[in-house]
Design a protein with these regions (language model features):
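Thiol/disulfide oxidoreductase modules built on the thioredoxin-like
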Residues: 43-44, 110-147
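Solvent-exposed loop/turn segments at secondary-structure junctions
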Residues: 55-57, 83-87, 112-114, 135-136
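Structural microenvironment flanking redox-active thiols in thiol-disulfide oxidoreductases
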Residues: 48, 57-98
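Cleaved targeting-peptide boundary
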Residues: 18-25
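N-terminal signal peptide c-region/cleavage motif recognized by signal peptidases
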Residues: 13-17
Length: 153
């Protein structure tokens, strides 16, 4: 009897987990604080979301955005980083102060809840194209040049 209850609870737990959104899904508006504690919003006008769940993906996005002059960066681009895996003391006293030196804003998901449904691949950056909250495409890149090329279209 205990085994049956255990298996049933495992089945329930897997169905209760958030599913990653895919192409043709409609996402909800997102609001996060950036590294300056200002709101950063994914709204109806947002066409590009750059997303990183790990350090490597974040480095790729940073290199891509730093390589583009400010006037060449798409206006409707939002960068979001899931920093929930980072120890809070490291985030507070080391990482976020360094992020304040960057020439762009990045939404910080400190708990990982907001971005739980965001697609990601290990050591890669995700580039999500939106049209009024509808997911048009999802690509994962392992080079900053490829990210720059994708968002410059």
């Amino acid at each position: 009897m205990k085994a049956i209850l255990f298996v049933a609870s495992l089945l329930f737990m897997t169905t209760a987990q958030a599913e990653v959104f895919v192409v043709n899904d409609k996402i909800e508006p997102v609001t996060l604080e950036d590294q300056f504690e200002q709101p950063l919003v994914v709204n109806e006008q947002t066409q590009w979301v750059l997303f990183s769940r790990g350090m490597k993906g974040g480095e790729l996005i940073q290199a891509s955005l730093e390589s583009l002059p400010a006037e060449k960066q798409p206006e409707n681009l939002v960068y979001i980083a899931d920093i929930s895996g980072m120890p809070s003391l490291i985030a507070r006293f080391v990482a976020i102060p360094k992020m304040k030196d960057l020439p762009f804003s990045m939404g910080l998901d400190r708990e990982g809840d907001v971005t739980a449904t965001f697609p990601s691949e290990k050591d890669m950056a995700s580039v999500i194209k939106l049209d009024k909250f509808n997911v048009v495409s999802i690509e994962h890149f392992d080079s900053s040049g490829a990210i720059t090329e994708a968002i410059s279209q």
